[in-house]
């Protein structure tokens, strides 16, 4: 009697293992792996609930968007969503200067000019955490972050440097207040 019970339990265990293996292998065959483009990854990022914590991270995300503008393929709808995502990183003061329509039109015009001149932004980098400068100006907390961009024009490369000014808002989020071109030092750059 004992042998029969052990044999039945062994058969049940083997059947369960085989059934589990079959289920797992069939599940993988049936599920299609969806590969998102960089534009789709940025556009589906929930910035409202997963906002970057540091000024450097804000600029890194903004740079991902810049790389999408100048380097990736996208539809006009995806570009509109991308510019909306970028505006979520901007301070209210900068948003007033860049309405939704104006910012989208400016990006379209700049991208068209780059294409006409056979220019692309081939790489971007942000200064390391130690190079971020924090300043208190009256009630405002400001941060200055350096970034650089490799620009490819035909077969030639050049490097452009920008300084981003970010301000901490009432929710504790760092928002881009301004950015402008500066003379730079490549030794401060880090991906």
Where are these regions (language model features)?
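Core segments of small alpha/beta cavity-forming domains
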Residues: 40-118
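Noncatalytic linker/hinge segments flanking ATPase motor cores
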Residues: 83, 88-90, 102-106, 129, ...
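Short low-complexity stretches enriched in small and charged residues
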Residues: 16-21, 42-43, 96-103, 118-124, ...
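Surface-exposed, charged secondary-structure patches
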Residues: 105-153
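Amphipathic, hydrophobic N-terminal targeting peptides for secretion and organelle import
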Residues: 1-43, 191
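Short beta-strand edge/turn micro-motifs at domain boundaries
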Residues: 28-37, 157-191
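Extracytosolic low-complexity repeat regions of secreted or lipid-anchored proteins
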Residues: 44, 142-154, 159-165
């Amino acid at each position: 009697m004992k042998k029969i019970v052990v044999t039945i339990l062994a058969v049940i265990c083997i059947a369960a293992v085989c059934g589990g293996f079959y289920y797992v292998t069939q599940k993988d065959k049936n599920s299609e792996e969806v590969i998102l483009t960089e534009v789709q990854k940025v556009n589906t990022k929930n910035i409202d609930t997963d906002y970057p914590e540091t000024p450097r991270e804000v600029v890194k995300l903004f740079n991902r968007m810049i790389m999408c503008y100048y380097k990736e393929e996208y539809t006009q709808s995806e570009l509109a969503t991308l510019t909306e995502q970028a505006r979520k990183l901007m301070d209210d003061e900068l948003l007033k200067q860049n309405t939704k329509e104006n910012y989208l039109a400016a990006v379209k015009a700049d991208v068209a000019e780059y294409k006409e001149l056979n220019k692309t932004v081939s790489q971007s980098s942000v200064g390391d955490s130690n190079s971020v400068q924090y300043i208190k100006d009256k009630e405002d907390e400001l941060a200055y972050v350096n970034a650089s961009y490799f620009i490819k024009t035909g077969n030639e490369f050049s490097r452009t440097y920008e300084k981003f000014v970010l301000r901490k808002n009432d929710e504790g989020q760092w928002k881009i207040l301004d950015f402008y071109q500066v003379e730079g030092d490549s030794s401060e750059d880090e991906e």
